[in-house]
Amino acid sequence: MNYQSYSDTICAISSGNNINQPISIIRISGKNAQSIVSKIFSGKVGENKTITYGFIKENSEIVDEVLVSWFLGEPQGDITVYNNYVGEPLIEINAHGGMIVTNKILELLISNGARLAEPGEFTRRAFLNGKLDLSKADAIHNLIMSKTRLQARNEASKLKGSASKVIKDLLKELSLLIGSIEVGIDYPEYIDDYEEDLKANSKEDINLTRINKLIARLEKIVKSSETALNYFEGIKLAIVGKPNVGKSSLLNTMLKEDKAIVTNVAGTTRDIVEGIYYLDNFIFKIIDTAGIRKTRQEIEKIGIERSYKAILDADIVLHLFDNLNSEDEFDLDIKKIVQENNKNYIKVVNKSDLKSDIKWSDDFIKISAKNNDIKNLEDHLLKIYSGFDFNSEDIFATARQIKLFKESLEYAYAAREEIKNQLTYITAIVDLNNLFDTLQLIIGNSNREDLLDEMFKNFCLGK
């Protein structure tokens, strides 16, 4: 991303682009923020952390009646301390909503010396000014973009620095390990005595203990983070079964809309239909698949092949049965594929409102999609997924963070083998230093511009 200058004064609409919103906020940040706003604001220039009333004017014409919040910093000796979000002079104009007036104020700020901010530039400046690290910036972005209350709660908990503390604790443990190994490099005579003592007392190498402890924590973080990210983005649920068991009816009931064709003709769903299903604090990406059976129609064969692929891609497979028809070879085929691929699997009997002579065992969940009676299914789904600890400090639920943790693990695995097999300690130090640097990237202790560009490009314009 080509930022023109970090010393420029920037501005942007921070309240979104809803044309009918009652109030809008225009944010201005930079060393010339006060002088630029003063050119278009008729009210009093406020002191730091005050709000003043007045009018935005273009020449003598009133554009809007506004409140202006001033965050101009406090002199402390020879420096000015900025206790605000960005860490530099910051002003926010609270105007009446509507894009005509809001854009006019933005236009006046730009014509008087400000420039339009890049996406995420306010937060980028906050990072560069030491007001936050990248783990907190990640939390802010994820909080804004949260799709469920669980996700929002998890990200909000990181605003006090819990994610940063996890990384710093890991770095502290890693520093002890690196220091211990470096002693062995610089003073090998002590290591010989140390290893003889280990053999005599059958004690595990303290360095091996430390790297194993570090690896266990990293593995836990990766597992928790991948699970959480999957839940936050949407759990993929494939509805599979023979034709005409009610898969499309169930999909429509869950989505509360007619997404799929529902008829009495078997095989009418020939492609995969997707929809988003919200259940309490969980998001499910529902996939309604073509019924699995023998067919001579080429187009239906393609749909059935896609159904098998949907099973492989799903996080959980909902195998739907018809209350009037017992299991057969096609149901067994589905069950076999699910078991071979170690998928979460639930068996659901539809049309429970119809009388049947079939005795279904207790592990079958009974519903009636046609009558919108799916509470048993919903309760079961919540039981499966509600046990996960969404408040864990080990959750770092962005693709960027997970990628860096996985890279860290690879360096840790390599270092462990070098320590375990008593290879040269110098090689272990190289991998451990790479591990240290990779963990530092998670909180942003790096001068890499490409890392910052990738980090902030997805932020909204006024953040």
From Swiss-Prot:
Mg(2+) binds at residues 248, 269. It comes from the Bacteria. One of its GO terms (cellular component) is cytosol. K(+) binds at residues 244, 263, 265, 268. Binds 1 potassium ion per subunit. Pfam families: MMR_HSR1, MnmE_helical, TrmE_N. Its cofactor is K(+). One of its GO terms (biological process) is tRNA methylation. The gene is mnmE. (6S)-5-formyl-5,6,7,8-tetrahydrofolate binds at residues 27, 92, 131, 463. GO terms for molecular function: GTP binding; GTPase activity; metal ion binding. Residues 234-386 form the TrmE-type G domain. Keywords: Cytoplasm, GTP-binding, Hydrolase, Magnesium, Metal-binding, Nucleotide-binding, Potassium, tRNA processing. Exhibits a very high intrinsic GTPase hydrolysis rate. Involved in the addition of a carboxymethylaminomethyl (cmnm) group at the wobble position (U34) of certain tRNAs, forming tRNA-cmnm(5)s(2)U34. The keyword Cytoplasm applies. PROSITE patterns: G_TRME (PS51709). HAMAP family: GTPase_MnmE. InterPro entries: G_TrmE, GTP-bd, GTP-bd_TrmE_N, GTPase_MnmE, MnmE_dom2, MnmE_helical, P-loop_NTPase, Small_GTP-bd. This is tRNA modification GTPase MnmE. It is found in: Cytoplasm. GTP binds at residues 244-249, 263-269, 288-291. Homodimer. Heterotetramer of two MnmE and two MnmG subunits. Its EC number is 3.6.-.-.
